[in-house]
Amino acid sequence: GINDEAIARAVDGWDVITTPLNDVRRIGGFSNLKQHWDADEHLRLKDLRHMYDILCTRHPDYKVDADAVLNGRTAAFCNMFIMRKEIFFEYNEWLFPLLDEFADATDFSKMDVQTTRTVGHLSERLLNIFIAHKQRTGAHWKIKRMQCVHFLRPDPMTTLEPLGTEYGRVVPVVFAADNNYVPMLATTIYSMLKN
């Protein structure tokens, strides 16, 4: 069963845990991740190219890894991962300036709801590029790939009460999602509340 002890056993000793690597040839016969991106009617190749340019300008040493990942056939999708704290902080310090620069230069006002999720799709690709770069440059992280679980009947929901001032500054967090992302949102919200 899934309980605290089982989860601790599953994650103990690993530096990074992600969803399994999916081969885009099996998802839809795509030859690489760029083609996979371009086939999605809600994603624009110009956005992927813009992020690539931002990444290569800010971090030229990542170009070889971006090329390998985007021209490659496999990636961990769903933006779901567990990392050692110091790796997580390093990843966020690297990731969010890239996403911020992209978002600042992008007009979201004429996008449909799904296309406004482009930043999330970009961050999926960036996770793979970050890991590829770190492994290529000698991080030697122990990486585990675990299946993504979709809970059909999670435990009954508890009623959430508004946070009082005893918690200090309260920061609202907003997600753009539909019913397909409820499991991921529930996990994210639970993690934020606990940490």
Give the positions of each predicted feature.
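ER/Golgi luminal nucleotide-sugar-dependent glycosyltransferases, focusing on the catalytic module
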Residues: 1-160, 164-165
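N-terminal anchoring/stem segment of glycosyltransferases
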Residues: 157-195
